[in-house]
Regions:
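Terminus-proximal functional modules
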Residues: 26-213
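Bacterial N-terminal signal peptides that target proteins for export
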Residues: 1-12
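Hydrophobic helical h-region of N-terminal Sec-dependent signal peptides
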Residues: 13-18
Length: 213
């Protein structure tokens, strides 16, 4: 992901990365914050407290959600995400967090990771019912990864309805996209992932706000 002409200093945590391009994320605006947010960071993250960028890399998605939340509690927000093989052929999820000194909102992140697209759609909808907004998606081996966020300071929750489309044929995806947008859904993101039974699968996520009860 391009970070502009003036690129702030960055601190890299985990393995060094060769040839990884970070995908851009849509912006919108969430786990329980520790009493002292800064104290939740690791020693190396604490040393990076004056830097604008933080790079997180892990093979476990559960670890990534925890580290993202710790960074968010210290004032960072999601800037980019990519899943892939790093230097030694290990599948890793890589996330870049960026500090925004002007932001005063408290953000909670939720990371979803599933092999089955049907399971992902169910988990997406549970997150949408809780007011989580789509931020980004990628793939990691045969897993589809989606990151959502919500502002913990909001007094009321805007529920979101999500729709996940998955097909091996792009022509079929075009037809399903047209039908979804005609029903009021807005495009959120798309990835090409390894299918559970081999081959590639196009995975597209759309959303629309829930109105009424």
């Amino acid at each position: 992901m391009a970070l502009g002409a003036h690129q702030p200093s960055a601190v890299i945590l985990g393995v060094s990365l060769l040839g990884l391009t970070l995908s851009s994320c849509s912006s919108s605006g969430i786990s329980t914050a520790p009493e002292d947010p800064a104290s939740a960071l690791s020693a190396s993250q604490q040393a990076a407290a004056d830097h604008n960028l933080l790079l997180l890399a892990t093979v476990r998605t559960s670890t990534m959600q925890r580290e993202m939340q710790q960074a968010a509690d210290a004032g960072y927000s999601l800037a980019g995400i990519q899943g892939g093989k790093t230097a030694w052929g290990t599948w890793e999820l890589v996330v870049v967090m960026q500090r925004n000194s002007d932001s005063t909102s408290r953000t909670e992140y939720r990371l979803l990771a599933t092999i089955k697209t049907s399971t992902m759609e169910e988990e997406l909808q549970r997150a949408g019912n809780a007011g989580f907004l789509y931020r980004a998606q990628t793939s990691l081996d045969k897993e589809t990864i989606v990151i959502l966020e919500r502002n913990r300071d909001l007094e009321s929750i805007q529920r979101i309805e999500y729709k996940l489309l998955a097909t091996t044929k792009t022509s079929t995806m075009q037809q399903e996209l047209l039908a979804a947008t005609a029903a009021g859904f807005n495009f959120a993101g798309v990835t090409v992932a390894e299918h559970l039974f081999g081959g590639k699968e196009v995975v597209t996520i759309l959303s629309r706000p829930v109105t009424g009860n």
